[in-house]
Curated annotation (Swiss-Prot):
Keywords: Cytoplasm, Methylation, Protein biosynthesis. The gene is prfB. Pfam families: PCRF, RF-1. This is Peptide chain release factor 2. GO terms for cellular component: cytoplasm. NCBIfam families: prfB. Methylated by PrmC. Methylation increases the termination efficiency of RF2.
């Protein structure tokens, strides 16, 4: 047992050193001090949007530094007790050391994943849309299951989740939903989820208990700021207003506050019914439209790179990316990377999603 702990400690120390180099805690402490000084200056909240971003950055820096210091202290504690011959032989102490090892190894893996996120927009927040495929109620129920998985996963990363637009199924589930994941590296992680997710199970809506196949498509696009120029001509769009709807199409707002914008050159359609006023929903729609158009430009650039790349893997946008099999056996398998797990319940609880994303980033991170 002691020899096994020694080997694991070597790996932890190496991982901690790599984490320190990539995180640059000293640099982040200096950045934190500068931002905190700005936050106490008079007139800081005159520009609410800018102040909000700075406040979020301060909170994120504090969280990163706190997590790194906790990791560093735990590794030091493990090292101290392993060097103490008497303590390392104690069975209760070995149990405690195992818990500390598991925590540190998990945290090191998270930092390793962050090192793979080097894209120009990877640190941004993002929009994530889920749409039901053919299959009626069964597919709508699958969308709701996928939504639950992403909600739990986002919570584990301490990202804020906003529901931008939602259309419930006629019997059960959800036909379409758009979320905004607000937090650092939300896009870097979530971009791996774009594509079609396939479900195989015995349908609870089928009295004959037959096995059904359902599909849900996921689309992820980054939030972009005003520094990125996306040209949208007024004549290229149509703006429609309608009443916000709840489950079963029931109106939840007596005014036409919901907004839908259609962009003719690309065929992109975005909608928002989350905000209280039509003006706010229109602004949110325009932000989404800018992001969608920019994402389309990125995809076109990526497709050109794929043509020029002969010996590297290609990405097929909108293709099936993952299978979720509930019956006759349990298996989740990513068709792009080959990564798979048998614990489908943990997957649907959002607990194993990061492992799939890391496998994707290892294979595709350099070209996304």
């Amino acid at each position: 047992m002691h020899e096994n702990f020694d080997k694991r400690l070597e790996v932890l120390l190496e991982g901690l050193a790599l984490t320190r180099r990539s995180l640059d805690p000293e640099g982040k402490e200096n950045e934190l001090k500068e931002l905190e000084q700005q936050a106490v200056q008079d007139g800081f909240w005159d520009d609410v949007a800018r102040a909000g971003k700075i406040s979020e950055r301060i909170a994120r820096l504090k969280q990163q530094l706190s997590e790194f210091n906790e990791l560093k202290n735990k590794v030091s504690t493990i090292q101290f007790f392993l060097e103490d011959e008497e303590s390392s032989k104690d069975l209760e102490m070995q149990k405690e050391l195992e818990k500390e090892f598991v925590f540190c190894e998990k945290k090191i893996t998270e930092w390793e994943t962050l090192r793979l996120l080097s894209g120009e927009l990877d640190r941004n927040s993002c929009f994530l849309s889920i749409n039901a495929g053919a299959g009626g109620t069964e597919s709508c129920d699958w969308v709701e299951m996928v939504l639950r998985m992403y909600m739990r996963w986002a919570s584990s990363h301490s990202w804020r989740v906003e529901v931008i637009d939602r259309l419930d199924g006629e019997v059960a589930g959800i036909k379409h939903i758009t979320l905004k994941l607000v937090g650092e590296y939300a896009y870097g992680y979530a971009k791996a989820e774009s594509g079609v997710h396939r479900l195989v199970r015995i349908s609870p809506f089928d009295s004959n208990a037959k096995r059904h196949t359902s599909f849900a498509s996921v689309e992820v696009f980054p939030e972009i700021d005003d520094k990125i120029e996306v040209e949208i001509h007024p004549g290229d769009i149509r703006i429609d207003t309608y009443r916000s709807s709840g489950a079963g199409g029931q109106h939840v707002n007596v005014t036409d506050s919901a907004v839908r914008i259609t962009h003719f050159p690309t065929g992109i359609v975005v909608s928002c019914q989350n905000e209280r006023s039509q003006i706010q929903n229109r602004e949110a729609c325009m932000n989404m439209l800018r992001a969608r158009i920019y994402q389309k430009l990125l995809q076109e650039r990526l497709e050109k790179q794929n043509i020029d790349r002969k010996n590297k893997k290609e990405i097929s946008w909108g293709s099936q990316i993952r299978n979720y099999v509930f019956q006759p056996y349990t298996l989740v398998k990513d068709v792009r990377t080959g990564y798979e797990v048998g614990n489908i319940q943990a997957m649907m609880d959002g607990e194993l999603l990061d492992a799939f994303i890391k496998a994707y980033l290892v294979d595709y991170g350099e070209i996304t």
